[in-house]
Curated annotation (Swiss-Prot):
HAMAP family: 16SrRNA_methyltr_C (MF_01862). GO terms for molecular function: 16S rRNA (guanine(1207)-N(2))-methyltransferase activity; nucleic acid binding. NCBIfam families: PRK09489.1 (NF007023). Belongs to the methyltransferase superfamily. RsmC family. It comes from Shigella sonnei (strain Ss046). It comes from the Bacteria. This is Ribosomal RNA small subunit methyltransferase C. It is an enzyme of class 2 (transferase). CDD domains: AdoMet_MTases. It is found in: Cytoplasm. It catalyses: guanosine(1207) in 16S rRNA + S-adenosyl-L-methionine = N(2)-methylguanosine(1207) in 16S rRNA + S-adenosyl-L-homocysteine + H(+). InterPro entries: DNA_methylase_N6_adenine_CS, Mtase_sm_N, rRNA_ssu_MeTfrase_C, RsmC/RlmG, SAM-dependent_MTases_sf, Small_mtfrase_dom. The keyword Cytoplasm applies. Monomer. The lineage of its organism: Bacteria, Pseudomonadati, Pseudomonadota, Gammaproteobacteria, Enterobacterales.
C-alpha cells in the first residue's frame, strides 16, 4: 500500500475540495490515501483485515474493521468517499449500510475503475443520493451526489444459502463462490481422505465449505478457519453452525493472527485483491506454512494451473506433488520434513 491506485489518483485531482471536509473512506481501500489526504478529519471503514492493518498503523482507532459499520464509525463525518469494489452485491451491502447511518446532506463521492462496473452506482443510489459523473481519468469514473434520503438497512436480508452434497453453506456479498461451490474447491475436496485426524487450518476459508465437507468425512479433526474478509469470517461461522460442526474462526492476513502448529493446512488461495492480480497471499501462505506445520504435516492447496507456485513450493519444502489436476486447476501437496525446516 505505497503507490496510489488509479482511483486514488483521480481523487487527488480534486484534493483541494477535500481540505475542509470530515471524510469517511470506505469500500475497496487498496492504498493508504485515507491516511495521507489532507482533510479536516478522516475515518476509514473496511471489511478487509489486511487493509485495516495498513490503515490502522497510520490512523489508529479512526480505521475500523467489521462486517457492518456502526454509528460510531461514521461519527462527525460530512463526506463519504466510497471506492467501488468489483462485486456489485458487496457494494450494495456496504453503501446501504453506510448511507443508513450518515445524515441527510452528506456529500457522497463514488470512485472506481470503469471495468469494475462503477457506473452502476448511479442506478443503485438513485433513490437516496442521485449521482452525477464529475471526472473521468485513468480509466476510472468519479461520481458525486448528496444524500437526500437514508435507506433502511437490514444485514440479515443479504444472507444467501446453497447446498453441497447435503451440506448447508451460508454466504454473504463479497464472499468467494457466493452462489455455489467453485470448480477448484471441488477438486481439492476430492483429494481429502476420510477419517483424517489432527489439527486442520483452513486459510482463506471463504464460506467455510472446505472445512464442513472435510469434517463430515473426518469428524475427529479439530478445525481452525481464517480469512481476511469480514463477510467470509461471519459466513464461515454461520456455515459451521448450520452443519453442527465445531471450529474456531477469526480474521487474519494469511498467518498474521494464527498461533501454533497444525497437522494439515488446506487452502484455495486468492490471486486477486480487488481488481488487481496479486500472488502475495498465496506466496505468503506457502512460505509461512513451514512455521505452522507439525513435523510430517502437509500443505494442500488448489490453484489455477498457470500460476507459478511449483517453484515457491520447491524452494520452501524441497519438493511438491501434484495429486489431482484438470485442464484449469492443480492440487499441490507438500510435506513438512527436515528439509523443509531448513528452508
Amino acid at each position: 500500500m505505497s503507490a496510489f491506485t488509479p482511483a486514488s489518483e483521480v481523487l487527488l485531482r480534486h484534493s483541494d475540495d477535500f481540505e475542509q471536509s470530515r471524510i469517511l473512506f470506505a469500500g475497496d481501500l487498496q492504498d493508504d490515501l485515507p491516511a495521507r489526504l489532507d482533510t479536516a478529519a478522516s475515518r476509514a471503514h473496511t471489511q478487509q483485515f489486511h487493509h485495516w492493518q495498513v490503515l490502522s498503523r497510520q490512523m489508529g482507532d479512526n480505521a475500523r474493521f467489521s462486517l457492518v459499520a456502526t454509528v460510531d464509525d461514521v461519527a462527525d463525518c460530512d463526506t463519504l468517499i466510497y471506492y467501488w469494489p468489483k462485486n456489485k452485491p458487496e457494494a450494495q451491502f456496504q453503501l446501504m449500510n453506510l448511507l443508513s447511518l450518515l445524515p441527510v446532506g452528506t456529500d457522497i463521492f463514488v470512485v472506481g475503475e470503469n471495468r469494475s462496473g462503477v457506473r452502476s452506482a448511479e442506478q443503485m443510489l438513485a433513490d437516496y443520493a442521485p449521482l452525477n459523473k464529475v471526472d473521468s481519468a485513468r480509466r476510472c469514473g468519479l461520481y458525486f451526489g448528496r444524500l437526500e434520503k437514508q435507506p433502511v438497512f437490514d444485514a440479515d436480508k443479504f444472507w444467501g444459502e446453497y447446498s453441497v452434497d447435503g451440506l448447508t453453506v451460508k454466504t454473504l456479498p463479497g464472499v468467494f463462490s457466493r452462489d455455489g461451490l467453485d470448480v477448484g474447491s471441488q477438486l481439492l475436496l476430492s483429494t481429502l481422505t476420510p477419517h483424517t485426524k489432527g489439527k486442520v487450518l483452513d486459510v482463506g476459508c471463504g464460506a467455510g465449505v472446505l472445512s464442513v465437507a472435510f469434517a463430515r468425512h473426518s469428524p475427529k479433526i479439530r478445525l481452525t478457519l481464517c480469512d481476511v474478509s469480514a463477510p467470509a469470517v461471519e459466513a464461515s461461522r454461520a456455515t459451521l453452525a448450520a452443519n453442527c460442526v465445531e471450529g474456531e474462526v477469526f480474521a487474519s492476513n494469511v498467518f498474521s493472527e494464527v498461533k501454533g502448529r497444525f497437522d494439515m493446512i488446506i487452502s484455495n488461495p486468492p490471486f486477486h485483491d480487488g481488481m488487481q492480480t496479486s500472488l502475495d497471499a498465496a506466496q505468503t501462505l506457502i512460505r509461512g506454512a513451514v512455521r505452522h506445520l507439525n513435523s510430517g504435516g502437509e500443505l494442500r492447496i488448489v490453484a489455477n494451473a498457470f500460476l507459478p507456485y511449483p517453484d515457491v513450493l520447491d524452494e520452501t519444502f524441497g519438493f511438491h506433488e501434484v495429486i489431482a489436476q484438470t485442464g484449469r486447476f492443480k492440487v499441490y501437496r507438500a510435506i513438512m520434513t527436515r528439509q523443509a525446516k531448513k528452508g
